């Protein structure tokens, strides 16, 4: 608020969005709660982000998705004078006409300029928000007349995305990974003139911070750079940092004996990490391992059924994995294996 975050909010944001450590994230959240209780509107905006799902916060952070509560908090933060709340409310469709009338800013532009000032002074999260304003087209709320000069969306992107690129890079330099996906889209579009050297430098730097990007970087090393073993090491690193997909990918390699000696016991441990992290493929593998009695696991049909059902009902379960689970569950229910 008033052009800068409180020390508590600034520290909490770094803990929640740059540590990828659940204990530190809990500490950061407690700091936000305390600040919010003392009337800090920015704290409310960041608390709201915690409940808006994995597009807004690390999926393994331990926050439950609560859209209704998040909307109320985001709108309240905007009406209390948080420029962060205003910009985030636009992105999450929470800047309703009534909220816009009630906020103490004369316009969206005024709120944007406050965040821009913080970004220019080096705040990484504000750099990210400024980049988003350009990337998603919200800059046309800042300068509505600019819309007249663009023929279509691509014409706008050709102007705005190179600007967004610069702000995303500044956010990366500040240790924030949140804009990486958008940055990759800019590179793929060819509109941002991002060289391979710059792209790979940021990719490696952010992979050292984010478990999710670490997994993706492992895939990049394996498929694009032809370094399968280095990619595996990145999968294992990501798994240790809490990324379920990294754990599953590494487990698959150890199970198949690709680039390394086959190690079913280690594969099982990695699949269990993936399963406990909520990954449907990992849950299926744990069901299969219990069904067959693989590795150090004794055959346990009840456990197998439990894992197969978790995978089957997982909202992110693919059709292929769902079909595999259904086949094994059919056998279990038909034969009374682990279902009685």
Residues of each region from the PLM?
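Hydrophobic face of amphipathic alpha-helices that form TPR/SEL1-like repeat modules
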Residues: 13-17, 46-58, 89-97, 129-141, ...
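Inter-repeat boundary and helix-capping residues of tandem alpha-helical solenoids
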Residues: 1-8, 25, 37, 64-67, ...
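Short helix-capping/linker turns of helical repeat alpha-solenoids
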Residues: 3-4, 18-19, 38-40, 53-54, ...
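Short coil/linker segments at helix-helix boundaries
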Residues: 53-70, 97-110, 136-163, 260, ...
